[in-house]
Amino acid sequence: SITEELIREIYNIVPKESQINALIQARYKSFVNVVKLSSDVLQLLKRVNKRYRLGLVSNYPCSRSIQHSLMKLGLSDILEAVVISGDVGYVKPHAKPFKAILNLLSLRPKECVYVGDNWLADVQGAKRMGMYSILIEQYTPYESFDPVSGDHNPDATIKNLNELEELLLR
């Protein structure tokens, strides 16, 4: 498993399967308990979902944690496709997670608007694929990254998700 490989590589030990399972279970529980979503954001996504098909690409390694959290938060019903980097074997900005979501939705890159909060993982990955990208600066301001030649700028930048509806539904 990826977890076992990481433990072996980082700590130079070979864990027992029971230890790996205990670690995965602890991480799973902590993730599911920490993830929150305001009712305002859920309602916003439901309104956006009336006009757009929604999918999710996550750099999280554990699919089970994400799926459980999506159900708990009420997002499973509005997300048509979910891609978890742990399942794909690559993290954003690598092309594979983006290609996977495009395949699941049967869409071409130009037909997609990718919304993310990480300039490197989300904006660079989406733009390299040819998607329109929107950067949410609520958590990590664009200025905190150090772009180099060949990097892409987001097509639009918003301060928080409340601005997304205005941008997408106008």
Descriptions of predicted regions:
Residues 1-26:
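A metal-dependent, Asp-based hydrolase signature
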Residues 42, 46, 57-170:
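Asp-based, Mg2+/Mn2+-dependent phosphohydrolase catalytic module
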Residues 17, 26-54, 95:
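Short, acidic loop-to-helix structural element flanking the phosphoryl-transfer center
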Residues 9-10, 30, 85:
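Alpha-helix C-capping/helix-to-loop hinge sites
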